[in-house]
Amino acid sequence: MIPAVADPTTLDGGGARRPLLPETDPRGRAAAGAEQKRPPATPTVLTAVVSAVLLLVLVAVTVLASQHVDGQAGGVPAGEDAVVVEVAASRGVAEGVSEKSTAPLLGSGALQDFSWTNAMLAWQRTAFHFQPPKNWMNDPNGPLYHKGWYHLFYQWNPDSAVWGNITWGHAVSRDLLHWLHLPLAMVPDHPYDANGVWSGSATRLPDGRIVMLYTGSTAESSAQVQNLAEPADASDPLLREWVKSDANPVLVPPPGIGPTDFRDPTTACRTPAGNDTAWRVAIGSKDRDHAGLALVYRTEDFVRYDPAPALMHAVPGTGMWECVDFYPVAAGSGAAAGSGDGLETSAAPGPGVKHVLKASLDDDKHDYYAIGTYDPATDTWTPDSAEDDVGIGLRYDYGKYYASKTFYDPVLRRRVLWGWVGETDSERADILKGWASVQSIPRTVLLDTKTGSNLLQWPVVEVENLRMSGKSFDGVALDRGSVVPLDVGKATQLDIEAVFEVDASDAAGVTEADVTFNCSTSAGAAGRGLLGPFGLLVLADDDLSEQTAVYFYLLKGTDGSLQTFFCQDELRASKANDLVKRVYGSLVPVLDGENLSVRILVDHSIVESFAQGGRTCITSRVYPTRAIYDSARVFLFNNATHAHVKAKSVKIWQLNSAYIRPYPATTTSL
């Protein structure tokens, strides 16, 4: 049992005592995490009039967002330049989103009364994460490298900031950060994809061809079918034009599979053995008993397909598997390296090679993965641990992260992971700001050879090229209940690397087991335990009325061993009440002799964190209203009741913007 203690206070640099976490910071009704469905949209004559007014507001907000100037002094008081507008009916389906969406289903009533200002809304747009110029975006699709350019396709609604009219947006980059927008790659213009050009994957063939398999939602029945497209000119480095096959659809739902439970084909792989030269493609599904499935098809020409004799894998009770991904991993360096150690998708199974099977679970909107062994003779996959099988074990990310997709980068010989980071604000706020969703920072993926049981994810090494001025804070003592401000200047675009050490005698002196702790059901950073929480507060204002806490929490297990949780607390991230605010996190493996380490990327309304070299990752969408522009701060804190903590090393860099923009027609360089 953890003893009750008084509220923590500390002395800051000026000698004034301040509360670590103020009691007067209501979360709003969304903070409990309940996701409420919207009533069906009902267009009216009034809606048409309101839509016209809304359009004028959106133009103003979009102009402000596009300028993205982060140099204003001080925060913006709530209510100044407030945007007050009725919300037009959603252009999405009745609930306002699709079954492919992970946006919070907030109600249209009392939760939508926050007075957002234009300055607040403009500040939320990210500076170095990928976003389209405007409107709704979801899954990353078909990433690849071609003739000097990285390509990213993505699910996009060109007409609105809500889901609908899904097309394929397209952008290119030399470095995975500085993106140039190209014209649409594919639009819903055939009966087999009239209701949406949904997710898919690219495969590069030995002869240089690039084939793109994608899911289409059909015009008459909204059935999910698989379609083939190829570049009109594969010699074009920008792959600006795509041609859909006359053979489409090339795959339809098989017997026993529901017509809307058959989607998101993987990158094809091939491991030739004897006369078997067929490519394998996996597709996500579920059966009538709600087991999640990965179906496998074999093809020589990507037009004609034969089903494999057995399922690649199935896990009872996990429901529909979306955006299945399947790829090999080799022994890495044991640390989160920026390049190398990746394997091409068709790498042959064998000693030292494992295969990752990942599924995005439609039931809970999280990305789960497992490590196992692939048998190309039977096209089946077996997890190394049944307890850590797909959908019941490890996740890529314990925060807001979904519909991910990897690709192999032949230049730096690495596997790169993309993930969709949806919004957790209201649809009304999305419409006001004119956009919804970002892509995560691309991450390298390696097998963690120190544990052998998990992946390591780390921001691609190119992120370090965005670093500008930096500061170091070494050997900072964090007494129990303390908060220490760090003077880093502008604190809205940051790369933070921190290493913490807990006094060994404090940890050894704890004798009581604490087996009930869980990040998501805890009180967040406000809760006090014997050995935690401690870490950093980012996007915080001076009086800590807004803050996003990234922290460790240590506890003793029943066997006397120390366990380490890594958590991210959004409960006080914003004063706005039209948000879903949660505490995310999970256990993170910490090996003997390792200090506690974390890397944090802060980019306006998104915070991505990587603990212990990327063993556990958490992504949050946060929407500060006070800790914005020059009012954003960074703090160290220790809210433990028993542990003395030292921040051995804290390095913080300001990051430049990526200046994502349309592709210039007169040049092919950045």
UniProtKB/Swiss-Prot annotation:
Record-linked PROSITE patterns: GLYCOSYL_HYDROL_F32
One Pfam entry name: Glyco_hydro_32N
Transmembrane segments: 45-65
Gene3D superfamilies the UniProt entry points to: Exo-inulinase, domain 1, Glycosyl hydrolase domain, family 43
EC annotation from Swiss-Prot or TrEMBL: 3.2.1.26
Catalytic activity: Hydrolysis of terminal non-reducing beta-D-fructofuranoside residues in beta-D-fructofuranosides
Subcellular location: Membrane; Vacuole lumen
Oligomer status and interactors: May be present in two forms, a 70 kDa monomer and a heterodimer of the 30 kDa and 38 kDa subunits. The ratio of the levels of the two forms within cells appears to be regulated developmentally.
Protein name as it appears in the record: Beta-fructofuranosidase 1
Organism: Zea mays
Lineage: Eukaryota, Viridiplantae, Streptophyta, Embryophyta, Tracheophyta
